[in-house]
């Protein structure tokens, strides 16, 4: 049976004709405003996370900054008051890569933030497999922050176990990434945080440009709409639902209503946050008639325990 990913990949042929011109943009360093500080005292690490992967990296970054003597707030983007952004000397934004891009809800949120002139900014993305256009997804975040006056000082992408649900959870990416994140991943995160601080101290920004990537062309296609067409059922099992409201909290568009067992298909972003976080396996989703199950159940069935960085033993972020 064709998987969602194989269906989407067939669209590469269409996107390839569009992607090449999209990958050449690069900002001139001279176009950036001056950094408002070379000695940040207060930093904000914002994250959007569905299965805990991105928030894990965000917390590790926050621990590293805290260890350097910086006052750090690490917050869920969906719960943060954007009017407070101007009070920070450094802003780092982290998000998963969805459909080869920055998630729509993250993009919409960043487009409405107030100006942050001269504030050092950095971005990172988490991803579950190679060829996910992760460099460009992180670049899209940087571009949005640039539009608000931010000065880019860092960008990176960190791989972890894939959490994009498939009927059998046995795609090549899911199998090859079952051991991630590992110690090397956390070392990469540490280097990212250290490099960000070093660039700020030097007053050095990074050049922001896109990579040549076939997946970049797919951004112009209605991938979410196409994927939802292949999801034949999306509801809530009233007999299993424990009314914990986890699905509502995790849904970025509040499309799900567990008390009514309904999902607003027009508002749904097909992010699988409801399925991947329901503790009672009450979210029912079928792909072309085949039942999906969520990330926690996948970990349980395969006896997978995700590694935590050692910093978390002493750092409470």
Go through the PLM ranges and name each one.
Residues 34, 77-160, 272:
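Helix-loop-strand module that forms the ligand-binding subsite of alpha/beta enzymes
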Residues 162-212:
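Glycine-rich phosphate/pyrophosphate-binding loop and the adjoining helix
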Residues 22-50, 56-63, 67, 72-74:
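C-terminal segment of N-terminal export signals and the immediately downstream linker at the start
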Residues 27-31, 270-317:
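Flanking helices and flexible, charged tails adjoining ferredoxin-like Fe-S electron-transfer domains
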Residues 214-242, 249:
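A mid-sequence, solvent-exposed acidic-amphipathic segment
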Residues 54-58, 62, 106, 134, ...:
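Short, highly selective alpha-helical patches that border small-molecule cofactor pockets
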Residues 1-18:
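N-terminal secretory signal peptides and thylakoid transit peptides that target proteins
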Residues 236, 242-269, 273-291:
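Iron-sulfur cluster-binding cysteine motifs and their immediate structural context
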